[in-house]
Swiss-Prot record:
InterPro entries: Ribosomal_bL34 (IPR000271), Ribosomal_bL34_CS (IPR020939)
Family named by the database record: Belongs to the bacterial ribosomal protein bL34 family.
Annotated organism of origin: Nocardia farcinica (strain IFM 10152)
Secretion signal span: none
GO molecular function, one term: structural constituent of ribosome
Gene Ontology BP, a term: translation
Cellular component GO terms, alphabetical: ribonucleoprotein complex; ribosome
Keyword Ribonucleoprotein: yes
Keywords: Ribonucleoprotein, Ribosomal protein
Source organism superkingdom: Bacteria
HAMAP family hit by this protein: Ribosomal_bL34
Pfam families for the chain: Ribosomal_L34
This protein's encoding gene: rpmH
Name this polypeptide is given: Large ribosomal subunit protein bL34
NCBIfam families in UniProt: rpmH_bact (TIGR01030)
Amino acid sequence: MAKGKRTFQPNNRRRARVHGFRLRMRTRAGRAIVSARRRKGRATLTA
């Protein structure tokens, strides 16, 4: 049986729009994610 196509098709603009910093700062939950990652000491906060 044939397998499906590869689902990860890299695209930097889409990556930023879907997981980026400005998107995270837009909602309360997103800001919570960024602050949690800061608290944990993550080197990268968002995409």
